[in-house]
């Protein structure tokens, strides 16, 4: 399985994995699966840090990489897919992540119920 972490899932994975449903946690830990984190998520979390809404270690990307989580860049194709999505979701970060899931055929590890409205596979966390 190719798993794509939503921003909150990545944060919980690093801070408090027990917040993640055991089935999702096992899937993320399974070495047979490939797990991805978007540069969009790092940007989203970084903005929350800059606004004082979140504390995030400066080595966040490095720690994710140490856990075997691969970075997924945000491309022009992803951007075009995001602006072409039906308007179920208004959050631009979530729309970008959903577009990446669609374009890359990834399973989205999220607690966001709106994500299921799109043509993606969701792994509930």
Q: What is each model feature region?
A:
Residues 1-37, 50-62, 104, 113, ...:
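Short, well-structured N-terminal submotif of metal-dependent ribonuclease cores
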Residues 12-13, 48-49, 85-86, 100:
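A generic structural signal for short
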Residues 28-29, 64-67, 81-82:
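Helical cap/lid subdomains and adjacent loops of hydrolase enzymes that gate the active-site channel
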Residues 37-38, 74:
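Short glycine/serine/threonine-enriched helix-capping/active-site loop
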Residues 45:
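Phosphate/NTP-binding elements of NTP-utilizing enzymes
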Residues 57, 69-114, 120-125:
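Active-site neighborhoods of divalent-metal-dependent phosphate/nucleic-acid chemistry enzymes
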């Amino acid at each position: 399985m190719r798993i794509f972490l939503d921003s909150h899932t990545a944060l919980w994975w690093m801070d408090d994995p027990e917040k993640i449903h055991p089935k999702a946690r096992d899937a993320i830990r399974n070495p047979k699966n490939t797990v991805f984190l978007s540069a969009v998520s790092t940007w989203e979390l970084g903005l929350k840090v800059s606004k004082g809404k979140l504390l995030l270690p400066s080595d966040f990307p490095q720690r994710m990489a140490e856990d075997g989580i691969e970075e997924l860049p945000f491309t022009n194709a992803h951007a075009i897919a995001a602006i072409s999505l039906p308007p179920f979701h208004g959050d631009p970060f979530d729309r970008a992540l959903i577009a990446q899931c669609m374009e890359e055929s990834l399973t989205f590890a999220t607690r966001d119920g709106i994500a299921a409205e799109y043509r993606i596979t969701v792994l509930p966390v």
